Structure formats: structure tokens, C-alpha cells
Amino acid sequence: MSSSKLIDLGRSYQNRAYRYARNELVSRKDKGPTGGIILADGVGLGKTYEALATVATILTQRQHGKEKKRRSQYHILVLVPPRLLTKWLDELILPDRFPRYLEDWNTPATRAVRDTFRNVAVIRGMGSLYEHKGKLRNRHNQLPPGLYLTKSTIIKKQGNKASQLRRTPWDAIIIDEAHHLKHPLDNKETQDLLAHNDAATLLLTATPFQLSPSELGGILEATFGGYGISGDVGKARSKAADLYYDDNFVEYREALQRLFREPTPADKRIAKRLKEPVSKLLRHRIIRNRKVEQRMYYLVDETGKPTRVGADLFRSSEVDICKTLEQGNAISLDEQSELAYLRVRALLSRLASGPRKTFLATSLRQLLSTYGQFRKTKVGRSEDLPQLPSENKHPKLVSVTRLARGIFKDEKSNLKSDNWIRKALVFTTYVGAEPGEATSKILGERAHGSAARLKRELEREMKRIFPRKKRRKERGAILKALLKVIEEHGSALVDDEKPRLQNVLRGFAGRPVTLLLLSPKNRPGALKKEMGVLRGDLEALSEQREMQNNESDEEYSEEMDRRRNERSRALFETILHRYSNRDLVARYDGATKTEERDRHLRGFNTPFAPLVLIASSVGQEGIDLQKYCAHVIHYDLEWNPAKLEQREGRVDRHGRILKGPINVYLLICKGTYDERMLHVMVNRFRWHHVLLGNRRYLDEVPGLTAETQAPPDLMNLALDLAPR
């Protein structure tokens, strides 16, 4: 393995993971079908870079005499959910992201790999797929070499129309958020893709199973996909079943299941005895690094006051949870809200026992989310429905509004010359409602009211700090400094890019948040820092366009030119989005246009607007929101603890600029169905962390120790899937 070029990702656990995956896949290539491996690192540990480094080093291994003829480029396919296209594109093309690891790859053996990673094509739909010139081989139209960043939905929805993707001889395939596959070989198109390519396949997921461990068995099928090359997909499925239903694995899982219900000393002995053999068995197909989470949990009451309940809430026993709730830290319903809840629950009980049964749990969750959402349901339109309070009096909406106001009041008072305002991320759930009446929309309207109050407070603060004359002077100083950077370093801007950026900066310089954060008088260092950021972005764009002018490809010159232009446009849009957000509160949900979502996401990762991002399930996976965010608010709970893990992982990940733990707030209505959900979720959380946990602690955070993992008696039984 030493003959291949190695990459230093900067963190020992990442290097250990990708090198283990590379060695495992290369050794299989010498024996038979390559198949795949699951990279299941905890949320925020850098699976994207591990996968890219694995692919790059595997391909350089092939260049060292493994292939009869050296190739100028390779075929790499990256399948990602639609909402993650922008994130992956940034990682692949921005100079300070993954490309920096390949800068010195100039030898004959590494140049082909470097050029492949530079030759990025984005496949958003069938139109963009048809744009790429293919060539005929074995009567099939195949794609030319390059790295194809592709929406995963194309494979499933387009069927035979996407035959170019399935018939291209891929050297490597990366599938992000692979837990959505569940049973990939049940999908004919995915089955075709894996069965016709003996590609090194990497499946990325922090949560290999959601509610049932059997889902892990489904994903394991994809790691044996190479056995379907002969057309015998049943062989791939059979080998996955052999692994998942291995006698030791079955006995281990059954013992753990009994431990969570009626624990006995015998079950503990069984699990402890089988822990190492089962870990060794699974490590050939799945590897996982874990870290100590940097989180502090709070319960919020009806006044919006948060009370800390420790970093180990989800590892607590049911008795401890009951004691915590009894202490009065959750949301207490007022008399009107409590009466409405009891009457609706009685109505639902009658309907549940009637001829046309209704689902009690879903209806109660809708009621506890917002009254507006509940009124739009079939039950909510019932003639027997009791009178509900007005929307503005919903206990959760009142609580979250007061909480947000309190958070930013503290943030504003703690703002110093060397720090920034720490932002808040609010997660909501549709709970079966139509998108037009979704919780995120209703909460968004309510939160915008809070944002309006916050804006007024900021404007009053501006008037106090800056009299009108001085305010105009401060705005002018900020604008002059940023426009000077454009004049000195904006030579790469083409067409109308320069005036567009200048116009955006004129609006940006006069906003209250900008004056508060970049005031040359109050925070002189902040403006200099922002000038450096803009200068670096413009220089990166200049380097990209200079490289674009110097590079050439005789066979695919027109195609390569189109792809490089696309990369340059993406870099410019990234610069533009930093300064173009106006709303202090923004939404990231399915009802928001993709372009607007991308703008909000990029703005949230800057010190400026938006300060609050309200996200639905669309925003709980795959995106990075960690740079300036320190507050995560769970407006609704989920039955699935893996979803909460994914939510909090948007912020608890490497790359945070802010120091200290993340504050996680739970809104739970006392004496309601929320309490039931919390108990169920805690039990499932234990099962999830024991089956996929390990004892390798990667980070040490002040105030957070190893005891913030699962209870010690269960952690001693947890599988260790860390790479060796």
C-alpha cells in the first residue's frame, strides 16, 4: 500500500479511517469483487473528506503498475440528496477545501487523479446529463472521464433515461446519506448501478439505522453490490444476510434487546463475551469514529427561561427524567390551553374507538405544535372540536419567542471587540400537515415578529451608539473599506459581476447588524478581518479563472470550459451571498426555493444576517451550520433519536469558529403527549448508541467528560467499530 500517494487530513482519526477503508477495498480488489464500505463516523467528524481521500489514494494505487495503461483521468460518481449539491460543490471546488490536499499532485502517477477532481460536473437533472458529451462503447452511450456530482433522485426517478449513469464504467462511487437507501437492492436502478460496476463504493451515514437495527442489514447489502456483476444480485444479498444474521451477531443483538427491557446478569455476560467477535466481524464493512459531544441541554418553561438539565439528559433513566419534569422546568399550560388540550384528547379518544379510527399520536403532536396546523387537519375541522385559544397564545410559540428574545438580549450585551453574535437554529416538524400550513411557516411568521422586535432593539441601539451624523459616517467608512478591496483585488470579476457586488455592499453597509458588528469606532479589528475575508475570496476567484485560462484538454475542450465556468460562477455566488441577506430571521424548508435556501445557508455561516434560521426536516441532514451558531432549539421532538442527533450535528461539528459548548433547548409541554415522546426517545437513544458506540474519545471539552456518553454499564457492552 505504500506505493500510493497519501493525504494528511490533519486529524489522526480521519487519517486512520480513510487509510483503513482504502486498505480494505484494495485488498478485496485482489481477491474478487471490490464492493463497498460504510463510513459511519459520528455527525460532524468529516466523513466527506475521508471518502474523497479514500477514493484519491485508491486511484493513485492503480496508477502504480496496477493497470496496463495509465489513464489521463478516471470516472468518479458522487450521489447526494438534492439539498446537499451546493455543500458538496463547495467542498470540491473552493480552494481552501479538499482541493488544497491535491495541490502538489504533479507527478505522472498523481496528475490524473488531481485532474479528475478538478473536472467536476454537476448533474441536477436530465437536461444537464444530456449536455455532457458521451462516447459509444459496447453500444452504450457513456459519460467521459471526470467527477460527476449527481442528485441521487435521478437514478431512481428517471429509470432507463439515466442509462448513461448506470452504464458508465465507474472507478469509484460515493453515496452520501446512505441510510435513506435502507434496502438498496430492492431498488432496480440502484441495483443496476452497483451490479454493472466493480467500483470502490463508499456509503456515508452517521446513522446507519434509524428506528430498527434491521435497517443496518439493508445498507450492508450495498457493500456487497459488486457480487451482482454477473447479474446474480441474490448473491450480494445472500452475503449481506450471512453477515447480519451471523450467529454471534444475532445472539448479541437479542441479549441487548432484553437488557433494555428486563436486564439479567446472563444477558450482560453474553453481550460482553460477543462484543469483540461481533465488532471484528462488522469492521470489514462498517467503521465508525465517535467523539464527546460538545452540548449542554436545557428545558424551557412558559416564560422562555431555560434551566440546565446537564449534558446527559438522553442518557438518563426514566425515573430521573420524571424527576426533572416534576421540578417545573418544562412548559406549564395555562388554564385555557390545558382545558383545550383535555377536551381535544377526549374527542380523539372517542374518534379512535369509532368506525373511522384516527391516529391519536399524530393529532396530539399537531395540537402541541400549533393550533393553526391542527385546525387544517380532518380532526381539526370536526364539528365537535372545542374552542381553541388564539394562535398567539399557543404555549410553545409564546415560549420560543421569549426564549429567542432572551438569547439575543444576552448576546448583544456580551458582544465584545473580539467575538461575534452567536446565532440560533430552530428545528420544527411538519407532523403530517400540508407544507402550506406547516409548522415552519406558522412559526416563521411568529418568529418574524420576534425578529422585528430584535431589529427595533438593534436600531435603538444604533441610535444610542451612533447619532445620525455619526451613523452616516460609520456606514461610509465600512463601504469605503470594502469597495477599496474590490478595486485592488477584483480584477477577476467579469461582465456585470463588479457592479452587482458593489450594489450589494452598498445595501449591506447600512444595515443595523453590519454597523453593530463592523463599526470602525467600536470594533476596528472586525472591519479589518472582514476586509481580509473579502480579499481572500476575490484572490481565490482570480486563481480559479487564471487556472481556467491556462488549462486545456484537447478531447473535451468545450466540455471542460463549460465546467470550469460553472465553478467560477459558483465561487462568485458564494461571495455575493455573504452580503446579500437582509432578513434577521430566515427559513430553510421545502417551501423555500432552492436558490433562496442556499443564500440563507451561506448567510447563516457568516457573522451577519440571518441571526435565526428556522429549519424543517430538509435542514436536519448534510448541511454545515456550525461556524457562528451556538444555540439549537428543538421546537418539536421526534420519535427517532437519530433525527435529533442529525439536527444537533449541524452545529456540533469540526470547523466551529466559536468556542465553548452548544446550548440545546427542548420545548416540552408538561403533562402532555410530549412527555411520552421523550421517554420513548430516550430508550431508543440508548439502543442506538450502544450498538454503534465505541470508547475512543477524540475530543476533550472543558466540563464535558466521558460520562456524557451512555451509562457505563451499557458502554462496556458497546461495539467498537473504530478503524485499527
Segments the model singles out, each with a brief description of its role:
Residues 1-24, 29-175, 179-200, 204-207, ...:
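Helicase motor interdomain insertion/brace
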Residues 50, 626, 653:
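Short, electropositive, low-hydrophobicity segments enriched in small/polar residues
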Residues 69, 626, 659-660:
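Short, flexible turn/loop "capping" segments at secondary-structure junctions
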Residues 160-161, 628-630, 647-648:
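Amphipathic helical hotspot of TIR/SEFIR-family domains
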Residues 215-218, 624-637, 663-666:
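A short beta-strand element within the Helicase C-terminal
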Residues 225, 660-661:
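Glycine- and acidic-residue-rich phosphate-binding/metal-coordinating active-site segment common to enzymes
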Residues 640-660:
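Conserved SF2 helicase motif VI
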